[in-house]
From Swiss-Prot:
Gene: PLS
Keyword annotations from UniProtKB, A to Z: Auxin signaling pathway, Cytokinin signaling pathway, Developmental protein, Ethylene signaling pathway
Protein name: Peptide POLARIS
Induction and repression of expression: Repressed by ethylene (ACC) and cytokinin, but induced by auxin (1-NAA and 2,4-D).
Organ and tissue specificity: Mostly expressed in the embryonic root from the heart stage and in the seedling primary and lateral root tips, especially in the columella initials and lateral root cap. Also detectable in aerial parts of the seedling, sepals and leaves, principally in vascular tissues of the lamina and petiole.
UniProt key word Oxidoreductase: no
Amino acid sequence: MKPRLCFNFRRRSISPCYISISYLLVAKLFKLFKIH
């Protein structure tokens, strides 16, 4: 999901943006835990 899609989506469909952002954050945390 590119950041541009988030800006394209309006208040009606903001959920997909949050889902993509949360997914990236979870992936980063998962990698950090794997390293440690």
